[in-house]
A protein has these predicted regions:
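Residue-level signal for inorganic ion chemistry
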Residues: 1, 28, 55, 92, ...
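Phosphate-binding loop and its immediate beta->loop->alpha context
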Residues: 1-20, 50, 54-78, 83
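A generic secondary-structure signal
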Residues: 12-19, 91, 95, 198
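Glycine-rich beta-strand-to-loop/alpha-helix junction loops that act as flexible
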Residues: 31-35, 162-164, 210-213
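Glycine-rich phosphate-binding loop of actin/hexokinase-like ATP-binding domains
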Residues: 37-65, 102-103, 107-142, 185-244
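Acidic/polar active-site rim loop that often engages polyanionic ligands
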Residues: 40-45, 66-75, 89-94, 240
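Gly/Ser/Thr-rich active-site cleft segment
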Residues: 72-189
Length: 244
């Protein structure tokens, strides 16, 4: 339930404010788990529980999407997998059509929190690359991939580089957290943001991240892909950087 994410964020920020003054904070960035599908109607209401990255219900939809867009691996740089967002939406279209018809916006988990913080529909390149709707080389939405899921650009968030400002903290949120209406930057998917945090920002740098999933993360200055190997190819959370 995305509302529980927001309630947890609100509690955490208030608890932090009880320990330290947040008035000196100059900006906020957001990072979070990737690939999850958060579906909103035209009134910004959540339509159903989010379908998270580790939900494997949409294997058939992966096959269908690659058949509909034969160039999908070239566009996205990736082999279509059930963990990605696009096949999840095609599953909803096929199995929950009454829900699908009401979709006004599709957001990734961290970007739902951004909406609640700023009122803005926005995402960063690294997280968007994990949807399978992004042309990863061009760092832009792919109309072909969206149309294959019966979706359009209007239902997608605006795209930003990870270091760009996507909006400002809403006055009511800032007041509740004891903060100024500071800028909120795009941020990144969990692994891309973690890579920036430990200095993995230049070509040929690499790291190993172990957690709920295991990730070997290698930075490049250009788009590289080998989808037949099932190695992910995504945008990094910084401009003009990609990663495998």
């Amino acid at each position: 339930d995305p509302e529980q994410w927001w309630q947890a964020t609100d509690r955490a920020m208030k608890a932090l404010g009880d320990q330290h003054s947040l008035l000196d904070v100059k900006a906020l960035g957001i990072a979070g788990q990737m690939h999850g599908a958060t579906l909103l109607d035209a009134q910004q209401r959540v339509l159903r529980p989010a379908i998270l990255w580790n939900d494997g219900r949409c294997a058939q939809e992966c096959t269908l999407l690659e058949a509909r867009v034969p160039q999908s691996r070239v566009i996205t740089g990736n082999l279509m997998m059930p963990g990605f967002t696009a096949p999840k939406l095609l599953w909803v279209q096929r199995h929950e059509p009454e829900i699908f018809r009401q979709i006004d916006k599709v957001l990734l988990p961290k970007d739902y929190l951004r909406l609640r913080m700023t009122g803005a529909f926005a995402s960063d390149m690294s997280d968007a690359a994990g949807t399978m709707w992004l042309d990863v080389a061009k760092r832009d939405w792919s109309d072909d991939m969206l149309q294959a899921c019966h979706l359009s650009r209007d239902q997608m968030p605006a795209l930003y580089e990870g270091s760009e400002i996507t909006g400002a903290l809403l006055p009511e949120v800032a007041k509740a957290w004891g903060m100024a209406t500071v800028p909120v930057v795009a941020g990144g998917g969990d692994n891309a943001a973690g890579a920036v945090g430990v200095g993995m920002v230049d070509a040929n740098q690499a790291m190993l991240s172990l957690g709920t999933s295991g990730v070997y993360f290698a930075v490049s200055e250009g788009f590289l892909s080998k989808p037949e190997s099932a190695v992910h190819s995504f945008c990094h959370a910084l401009p003009q950087r990609w990663h495998l």
